[in-house]
Amino acid sequence: MLAENKFCEAFMDYTYKRQNVYALADEKQLGVISEYAEGYKKFLDNGKTEREVVAESVAMIEAQGYKAYVLGDKINPGDKLYYNNRGKGLFIIRAGKADVAKNGVRILVAHVDSPRLDLKQVPLYEKADMAYLKTHYYGGIKKYQWLTIPLALHGVVMLKDGSKVTLNVGEDENDPVFYITDLLPHLSQELNTKTIADGFQAENLNLLVGGIPVKGDEKDAVKKGVLNILNAKYGICEEDFISAELEAVPAVKAKDVGFDRAYVASYGHDDRVCAYPEITATLEANTDQTVMCILADKEEIGSEGSTGMQCVLINDLLNEIAKSYGANPSVVRENSKCISADVTAGFDPAFASAFEDMNAGHVNFGVTMNKFTGARGKSGSNDASAEYIGYLRQVFAKAGIVWQTGELGRVDLGGGGTVAKFISNMNIDTVDMGVPVLSMHAPYELISKADLYTAHQAFVAFVE
């Protein structure tokens, strides 16, 4: 006799159906979804770069009693700690009463870097009496999308004397913005015959930053005028760009979309739309489990370097937890569980051929689990086990979470990767789960408020 399937038995319906979160929600629940999104929009506007997201997150958790952790310090049950990784990554540790040797650590990891335009180390030049800053794009972008939109400049500059200057120009209503020009349609006959890749060259993604020449100077007078302003306001000289990290990002705020305000458009949903709910879930959850909430850098370029998830820092911190609890680090890792909280591609009816409808994440139908990512034959993917997904199904069913399953587009069309494979390589069960996004990697992306809130709910259920 076949065992009864308790999930299907309640409805006497053995089919899989997605559920529209908005259709299920009553007026009170709609209000909760909307209110939660307001906090998220402020988080987005205050954090346009990975450094700003980390600073904003530290402020959030310090307000809840979290303290800075130093490697080597003992971690005690009940401690609320964070490790700030070079100002660009963050590890939030909530030390629980449960046995970490038996239960492991509940790990949530999202990334807080987003596609953008970085300034080159020698960026400033003048041409045709106009001053420009040269850029080098970061992450996967469609270059043409960055033309003719208002851009802000964020980041830090290390001066010759060792002091640090923080820049944020273009966000305040009274600030100037920066701009990349495009060719008018009247003269685009030749340009229109080229492919997008040939027509929009990376070396032409240069920011227009000035136009008033210094009086009495004949050569590079406009460039000198810009340098005079930078030196007067910030103490910056041209050589200081060598030790700077300056990022051009869209100078736009997060805004509701639609007459019914069902959606939020913003820069940086990928992956701050998962970072925010994993923070709020860590703060809100009522749990005895030890929780590690990670905000990682460098995911968009392969998770490389000291602030990416290929760095050994996560292992160091797990070892510190194990040592503090008197547990074997290998056993702690073996019994830990992880959700790689990263966005997925939402099914877009305008580009339906890029998807396989039945196995795509649909906007408004809840947070989406991707069993695997990768490309073509799952190349470069973490492929989560049936047992681990079965465990999460039970967790979410018990908590009444609305969620769905999906893949990143049609087979053989393209693909993508996340940090999941780096976590699972440590012998930790890991699966990708995040919010479906429309126009992913565009300067202005779109998500559903309902999907955002179900991510928060799912992450709470996971850590509890």
Where are these regions (language model features)?
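N-terminal hydrophobic/helix-forming segments and targeting peptides
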Residues: 1-464
